[in-house]
A protein has these predicted regions:
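Short hydrophobic alpha-helical segments enriched in small aliphatic residues
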Residues: 561, 587-589
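Charged/polar low-complexity intrinsically disordered segments
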Residues: 591, 598-602
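Membrane-integral, polyisoprenol-dependent glycosyltransferases
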Residues: 1-320, 339-343, 379
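Membrane-embedded architecture of ER/inner-membrane glycosylation machinery
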Residues: 123, 127, 260-582, 604-607
Length: 607
């Protein structure tokens, strides 16, 4: 957006990306304008709203139930697993959660008899809905509107003239339209055709912005008929049960919520009833739709409010919940310590990729990479496991026979330490999940054009950290397939036959690809034409021209023919291989070939 000056149509490598509204991208671009283009600047808006939603939940709880309950609601929100886990990736859901929470609070403030300024809160309600439309489109209005409808119906206020008078619906609608319509109109005008009612979504079809954004992305996605089918769905039962993990450790107190009063006879009862409508609609909605694990995040504040209200009651259910937490924390501590003992003598050559399996079919789910873990892989995670063991011991000891306040403090402290372990684990996974090491290696080599193989998102960090335009090999698929079909799509896509011509040119090219593509590329280009510049996390950087510190890729059975005069890099001569690093040549490649599917791992790229 900053480079092109086009703040209407989001683009990936110049290709129109019409799936999502632009507000989160505007925030990132503004952050870049202020702080410069850095990865932390991109994440800053998300981090601020993550803090903001915790503070907003606490303020909502204080208004509804008092200071202690509000504090506990904020504590639940800020230390639950779900909020931490699903804000490690840059998605707008936490900002959407903020706008929905604000709209729910504003609705109650509008309807409150002793509220001195209901008109202002009606405008806050409308503004939050309009802002949400620019974050994640229709669900930003559907969720709070449906929850509010159920609440008004349950409290017999739906057909009350007083209710609608205080809500100022016409002024509110004008505010919503004023905030959201200009971008939708501009996006439609800049991405024609303007109108289509086709209910078919398939490859090569292009119907403009309006059809794609509303019919393909909203209706057909809900009906599981959307193309491209680049998403998966969590089984319904697991979608519900996973909330025991997302709300951990506070989910042990959920049974205590059942003892609360939901009668709207006082402010606390009204908030609980609205929270119930709020949670219920979101969970039921996604029960009948395709869903990811994090889709229910907008319901977390409502769950936190109910838990905060239950935690001040200190009922017998709270005591039983604390006992359950003691047992769970003890079992987790024992499991983590067992892993540390089992892996105490396991070697950890290279990065964690060496010890992982591959389940690409699961990667469209947020936790898909968890299936890649093996017993050996935990040896690379010794420090995170140690911190996790300490965390669970804090939880087990701190909650044992503890009074509620002490137990809540111990649970919160447990999560703070656990999150530090999770952060260290993410650093360990960085070479596998990120391509930053490859980008840094490219920047230390002679200038050349950059090609990424297949999926843009797999190597998006290469584009970010090198700040170079890309050519995409077979990349007109998944999220880029629709933009690639546009009449004005940039010529940034290559296919295998074109790569053969490009690779033979005198101009230098770099190709970033996965180790799984070696057989295909060797058959297509020839092994002697693949000069390895870097390897990290199962990904290679090749160049079409020889570099003094480049090597040949490892042999792949049935595809290799040794180049005269160059070492064929067999398993017996692996010690002769040298892999380029950002600082020069790394002579310490491991001498043991580590087996991966179809490939013998013989070389390492290390920082």
């Amino acid at each position: 957006m900053i480079r092109s000056g086009d703040w209407v149509t989001a683009r990936l490598d110049g290709v129109a990306y019409l799936e999502k509204p632009p507000l989160v991208y505007w925030m990132m671009a503004c952050s870049y304008k202020v702080f410069g283009v850095h990865d932390w600047a991109a994440r800053l808006p998300l981090a601020l709203f993550c803090i903001g939603v915790c503070l907003l939940t606490a303020a909502f709880g204080i208004w509804a139930f008092g200071k202690r309950a509000g504090f506990y609601a904020g504590l639940v929100m800020s230390t639950c697993v779900g909020l931490y886990l699903f804000t490690r990736v840059l998605i707008p859901d936490v900002i959407l959660t903020f706008t929905i929470t604000l709209s729910m609070w504003a609705l109650l403030r509008v309807l409150e008899e002793d509220e001195p300024n209901p008109r202002a809160w009606a405008f806050v309600l409308a503004a939050s809905l309009g802002t949400g439309l620019l974050l994640k489109s229709l669900i930003a209005v559907v969720f709070p509107a449906a929850a509010g409808f159920l609440y008004l119906l349950a409290t017999r206020q739906l057909f009350s003239a007083r209710t609608w008078k205080r809500l100022h619906p016409f002024t509110g609608l004008a505010i919503i339209l004023l905030i959201s319509v200009p971008w939708h109109v501009l996006a439609t005008l800049r991405n024609p055709p303007y109108f289509s009612l086709s209910m078919h979504s398939g490859p090569g079809e292009y119907h403009g912005f309006l059809w794609f954004f509303f019919i393909n992305e909203q209706l057909l996605r809900f009906l599981n008929l959307r193309y491209p089918r680049d998403y998966n769905t969590v089984p319904r039962i697991w979608f519900w049960l996973f909330h025991l993990i997302w709300l951990f450790p506070w989910s042990v107190y959920l049974p205590a919520v059942g003892k609360l009063s939901f009668k709207p006879v006082d402010r606390a009862g009204r908030v609980r009833l609205l929270a119930l409508c709020w949670i219920g609609f979101i969970l039921v909605f996604f029960t009948f739709s395709t869903t990811q694990e994090y889709y229910s995040m907008p319901a977390y504040p409502a769950m936190a409010l109910l838990l905060g209200s239950a935690m001040i009651a200190e009922s017998s259910w709270i005591k039983w919940g604390t006992r359950v937490l003691t047992v769970v924390a003890s079992l987790c501590a024992a499991a983590v310590i067992t892993l540390l003992v089992l892996d105490r003598n396991v070697a950890t050559p290279g990065d964690i990729f060496n010890a992982l399996t591959s389940h690409p079919g699961a990667y469209t789910l947020s936790l898909g990479h968890m299936e890649d873990l093996t017993l050996q892989s935990f040896a690379y995670l010794r420090m995170p496991l140690l911190l996790a063991a300490i965390a669970f011991l804090i939880g087990a000891i701190g909650t044992f026979a503890a009074k509620p306040k002490r137990a809540f403090f111990a649970a919160a402290l447990m999560m703070v330490v656990f999150f530090q372990g999770a952060r260290v684990a993410l650093v360990t996974f960085d070479p596998y999940l990120s391509s930053r090491p490859l980008a840094e290696a490219i920047l230390h080599e002679p200038d050349g054009k950059l090609i990424i193989d297949r999926f843009y998102y797999t190597y998006s960090s290469v584009a970010f950290y090198t700040n170079k335009p890309l050519l995409m090999l077979n990349g007109d698929v998944l999220n880029l397939s629709y933009g690639a079909s546009a009449p004005d799509a940039p010529k940034v896509f290559l296919h295998d036959e074109q790569l053969k011509d490009v690779w033979a040119q005198p101009e230098r090219y770099y190709l970033v690809t996965s180790h799984t593509q070696l057989p295909r590329l060797e058959k297509l280009l020839g092994r002697d034409k693949l000069n390895v510049v870097a390897f990290s996390g199962g990904k290679y950087v090749f160049t079409n021209q020889f570099l003094p510190n480049s090597t040949l890729p490892p042999e792949v059975a049935g595809t290799n023919t040794p180049e005269p005069g160059r070492d064929p890099a067999s398993a017996n001569s692996v010690s002769d291989l040298r892999i380029a690093t950002p600082s020069g040549v790394h002579p310490d490649a491991p001498k043991a070939a580590l087996a991966k599917p179809q490939i013998q791992r013989q070389t390492r790229y290390s920082l």
